[in-house]
A protein has these predicted regions:
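Active-site helical microenvironments for divalent-metal-assisted chemistry
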Residues: 1-173
């Protein structure tokens, strides 16, 4: 294993801490969360809300890497007008490059996102995180972010995650 390449990949991944979420920037959120903060939020939801029939460890791994490709392609949102297939191809190419030089193969985790029971659960937690963050920013900064909540609700199945996303207002922060 080449330690110089491994070190480069580890350092590059840390840049997710500085990459702001594009949707929040577009809406004028002050000090928007980073992609890394979002990934932590998704992992937190997976850890706390994981049902018994889902492999928690696998779901956590998927949650941690689900937006890793954004290091190279940026945080592409539906408002950017990028064809979803083109976005997926860009992200796959970026992820493949980022996966080289690591002591573990991360490709199965990114391929599972949305495509296995664990991956679908993580994707649902991704939408829940967006809705909860919209509620939080709306309460703290007085912004109208209902479109983010509505987008999440449109993609969430009935049940606990949808109920949490639909919350009328967050508790006192």
């Amino acid at each position: 294993m080449r330690t110089d390449l491994l070190r480069a990949r580890l350092l590059e991944a840390l840049t997710l801490k500085e990459l702001p979420r594009a949707g929040w920037v577009r809406e004028g959120v002050q000090q928007p969360e980073s992609v890394a903060a979002h990934s932590w939020g998704v992992a937190w939801l997976v850890l706390v809300l994981c049902p018994k029939h889902i492999n928690r460890e696998q779901a956590l791994c998927i949650a941690i890497v689900h937006d890793l490709a954004e290091l190279r392609v940026g945080d592409i949102t539906p408002h950017d007008g990028v064809d979803p297939q083109d976005k997926a191809a860009r992200e796959l190419a970026a992820f493949s490059a980022l996966n080289t030089g690591l002591p573990v193969d991360l490709m199965p985790f990114t391929q599972a996102y949305g495509n296995t029971p664990e991956g679908r659960f993580v994707k649902a937690c991704d939408k829940l995180d967006m809705a909860l963050q919209a509620q939080r920013y709306g309460a703290i900064q007085g912004l109208a972010l209902q479109e983010f909540i509505d987008s999440a609700l449109a993609k969430l199945e009935p049940g606990l995650l949808r109920e949490l996303a639909a919350g009328a207002s967050p508790p006192e922060l």
